[in-house]
Regions:
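Active-site-facing alpha/beta catalytic cores
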Residues: 31-37, 117-272, 276-277, 299-300, ...
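N- or domain-start disorder-to-order transition segments that initiate the globular core
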Residues: 41-78
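Conserved phosphate/anionic-ligand binding catalytic regions in large, soluble enzymes, centered on
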Residues: 86-96, 353
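Conserved, mostly hydrophobic/aromatic
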Residues: 90, 295, 357
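Glycine-rich anion/phosphate-binding loops
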Residues: 94-112, 147-159, 314
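Internal helix-turn-beta structural module
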Residues: 333-374
Length: 378
């Protein structure tokens, strides 16, 4: 007991010392003739540590059970132990939690309806990687007004994920950095590493430590090798810098993630055809990896036309009916209202990439369920 008190006391003393050193360094820097630190930084704000949100919004037993089961089910799909089709479907990005919950309520009905053929997981993306500039997502700018209330954005993201899981809808998301997973990764059943970050060393290291299965997209130019290399890298242990739940800088040592797979999202040309799928599976086998892969119905595979997602789904369905067993999943961008808008004026419509509407969503899921039913029929 005394030893613990001494440790706590020493920790507090160190904090005071470090704070004093920092203030002294700041004062010195401000009076330097040639300042070299934080020259282009306008402001630094304190971020609430992950533990603050985890304490306020703790995971429930129901949510934990759903996440645990869904992760194992997806891992079984990746390793060929389950013959259902994983469907990652939902808005391109979340900007309105109310609309997201209405979408989830509708999707939950279809999740139960097709549970024997499809494993439906809602796409719940809070962060948007940008080629240049633009709205970066609910976490970065939750009020959509350029105030960048990130503390509120992180809380809103966790609150939505908790509600979704409590109602029985598992969630998926894209991971963009090394810090935000500490705030809500316990509520995620499947994660994605995007085409712009698959080749990044830190994202491969991050994936090696995530508790959920992870999909790596091929590069924006269609390069599949970088995704295959990423899977191999993520399966091994790594050390990298991140933060603890208490918000302190830390060295993270991972154990490696054996449940990663490729996502074919197209490049200069679409890559979802029978020939592309077979070629990708052969390359995965040659690399000593599972040949199971996912097809992204959007992005370059749809030639950035949301209406063509149905064409991709129809092609995938035909492959399933013909016995193609290496397609373990699809990804679809879908919302309550089809299309997109620049400002959030239409309820249930995307403000980032255009999505298919709800009627098409129902039609597509029925198509995929029927195709997979035929694929697994004796």
């Amino acid at each position: 007991m005394l030893r613990d008190r001494r440790k706590a006391c020493l920790k507090q003393v160190k904090k005071v010392i470090y704070a004093s050193i920092y203030l002294n360094l700041k004062a010195i820097t401000m009076t330097q003739q040639y300042p070299t630190d934080d020259i282009k930084i306008r402001e630094v704000k304190e971020l609430l540590p992950p533990i603050a949100h985890l304490y306020e919004l703790p995971i429930s037993e129901e949510a934990a059970g759903l996440v645990h089961r869904t992760r194992h089910e997806i891992a079984d799909l990746v390793h060929g132990k389950d013959n259902r089709l994983l469907v990652i479907i939902g808005p391109c990005s979340i900007h309105d939690p109310k609309a997201a919950l209405e979408y989830a309520e509708r999707l939950l009905v279809l999740r139960k309806k097709y549970e024997k053929e499809l494993l439906i997981v809602m796409r719940v993306y809070f962060e948007k990687p940008r080629t240049t500039v633009g709205w970066k997502g609910l976490i970065n700018d939750p009020h959509l007004d350029g105030t960048f209330d990130i503390n509120y954005g992180l809380r809103q993201a966790r609150s939505l994920l908790l509600t979704l899981n409590n109602m029985g809808m598992p969630a998926s998301t894209e991971f963009l950095d090394m810090i935000t997973p500490q705030y809500y990764a316990d509520l995620i059943s499947w994660g994605a590493i995007g085409a712009r970050t698959t080749e990044s060393q830190v994202h491969r290291e991050l994936a090696s430590g995530l508790s959920c299965p992870v999909g790596f997209k091929n590069g924006t130019d269609g390069n599949l090798k970088i995704a295959i290399d990423a899977i191999g890298a993520a399966s091994h242990p790594h050390h990298f810098l991140s933060v603890t739940k208490a918000g302190h800088s830390a060295i993270v040592h991972t154990g490696g993630n054996p449940d990663c797979h490729v996502i074919l999202r197209g490049g200069k040309e679409p890559n979802y055809s029978t020939e592309h799928v077979k070629s990708a599976a052969e390359q995965l086998i040659k690399a000593g990896l599972s040949p199971k892969l996912m097809v992204d119905c959007s992005h370059a595979n749809s030639r950035k036309d949301y209406r063509r997602q149905m064409e991709v789904a129809q092609d995938v369905a035909a492959q399933l009916e013909n016995g193609e067993d290496n397609i373990m999943g699809v990804m679809v961008e879908s919302h309550l209202v089809e299309g997109r808008q620049d400002k959030p004026e239409v309820y249930g419509q995307s403000i980032t990439d255009a999505c298919i509407g709800w009627d098409t969503t129902e039609e597509m899921l029925a198509l995929l369920a029927a195709a997979n039913r035929k694929r697994v029929a004796p």
